[in-house]
Amino acid sequence: FSSAKDPVNIAGFVAENILRNRIKMFNWEKAASLDNENILLDVRTPEEFRKGNIDGAINIPIDELRSRMNELPRNKTIYVYCQIGLRGYLASRILLQSGFDNVFNLSGGYRLWDACSKEKQETVVQSRTLIA
């Protein structure tokens, strides 16, 4: 037996999701282009949220999700994320099992979004420097 975040367990979650299509995923680029017609839900702790989050996200920690589900509109698409993906996966499953239809989980979580969006910003700055 190993921890929940062990790479073997994560690989198992990914494989099960692919085989059974349990959770729809979205990537970090999509997270940057969401509009007000969608809900971006951060299920990390308030402390993690304060340290950094995706613009426009609302924070409902996974431990509070069941008791605060009434704060989420059922007629909008909900894009869920956590730090690396596990809590987002679990939150997505909770929402789907509670009758929410359009739920997506961020592949790689906030950590990947943060790394990729910073890398993209640095590339744009470098490109502008080269052009000037």
Residue ranges of predicted features:
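Rhodanese-like catalytic fold shared by cysteine-dependent sulfurtransferases
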Residues: 1-39, 46-79, 83-132
